[in-house]
Amino acid sequence: MRKVLTLVLVAAAATADETIPGVRLTRDDNQHQHTFADLWHDAGEQQDWVVQTRRELHRTPELLFDEKQTAAKITQVLTALQVNFTTGWAKNTKRAELAAKGFVSGEGGTGIVAQIGSGKEPCVLLRADIDGLPIHENVDSPWKSTEDGKMHACGHDGHAAMLLGAAAVLKRREAEIKGTIRLIWQPAEEGGAGGKRMVEEGVLSMEPKPQAAFGFHQWPFLPLGSIGGRPGPMLAATELFDIVVSGVGGHAAMFAIQRVT
């Protein structure tokens, strides 16, 4: 899967000794020198499994700070891959505040942080989000949402599955990775600021501290196999605000007597 490969290449390049044609994951010039084609092959082997995982996650979407089944699936896979991880990240400390804004949220603690590599510097961080949206899915497919009023309408099922695919490829080559690759599955991206909560809990202060962090979002308007980026902000976010207008109302045909203070 090409997006799995993108994550692997980013991690490999950031933890390699130097940049050379292909991708180098080791200091030994005579062994374990893997080309783009090697990593492409490894990622391709994960494709069917990643697609199946994505569809499983799509069937059971969960809303912000309530992604318990999703987190359980992710940790089940990480355990099978023998990848070290910690759970309980992103506890929801603003449940009442979110409710006042119209969000139904859970207790949180559904964030996951995994680690692959030597445990030494350099460290690169890869991040995926995992929550769904309060939208009813009308599309009829074998992997349609089984939860009324909930849907993975923003692709976070795919993001979570692709990061698991990258974990599988990277774990296979763990002995060749000089530095550390930290993988984060973030809850509550859709209005709950789950990533900010994980930062408050110290995810960026863990040793070794990451020198770079990467996240990406699927984008159907780009050709398959391509990736887009730019310096600075890339995508927009939503925010809620109130506008209070005070004054004297009236008929639309009598606006002369109306006023706004």
Q: Residue spans of the language-model regions?
A:
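Cleavable N-terminal signal peptides of Sec/SRP-targeted secreted and luminal proteins
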Residues: 2-15
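Hydrophobic alpha-helical membrane context
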Residues: 14-15, 141, 168, 229
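Acidic/His- and Gly-rich active-site-bordering loop/insert found
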Residues: 20-152, 161-178
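Histidine/acidic-residue-rich, glycine-tolerant segments that coordinate divalent metal ions
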Residues: 102, 110-112, 133-134, 140-151, ...
